[in-house]
């Protein structure tokens, strides 16, 4: 495990910058709680607060702007999109964090495009200089210093084994059968998205968290 926050070129603190987040719903936060508890045992990890558990849609350049204009433009751009049901993998250790990787679907790509267009309409042509995330994902914990991956992997695997043992059908949670094909047997749950938040985001490198002030929540369903 390496620190998520050591490369200023990619992980520079947002310092109140606007982001568009898809927040994890209560059932997903509850499902991930045992994994977060397992991660909390490791000093090299900083837990993301459950209330701020999210999938980043897009990071924006502005620190402020016409929130009402963004919401109106976003609803227009998302017309006909429908609710997203993204299959999400079991929590896994990557180089600098513990994440649940989601499937990139045509709906997710359209959501990103809608967010870009709405941001430009509301905040100007320079509003979206950043690339979207490599894939939709939820980060349970960020690396804050060097650490050994193996015990983290083992702890997460034990939680998974316990969950599967406690279910009748070998699945920890109900999932969308159609979307499941995108990830297959490694699917943990489904991330349902019918709204996003426009938020002013803050990074705490010492404890390894991203938190936010929500400026608006906007739904298109």
Predicted segments with their positions:
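Flexible phosphate-binding patches that engage nucleotides and nucleic acids
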Residues: 1-26, 68-96, 121, 126-221
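The feature marks the first
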Residues: 9-44, 50, 57
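Hydrophobic side chains in well-ordered alpha-helices
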Residues: 31-32, 70, 111, 152
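Extended intrinsically disordered, low-complexity coil regions enriched in Ser, Thr, Gly, Ala
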Residues: 47-52, 66, 150-151
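Extracellular/lumenal glycan-associated surfaces
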Residues: 49-61, 133-143
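Helix N-cap motif at beta-to-alpha junctions
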Residues: 61-64, 105-108, 144-147
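Small-residue-enriched alpha-helical segments and adjacent helix-cap loops
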Residues: 111-119, 196
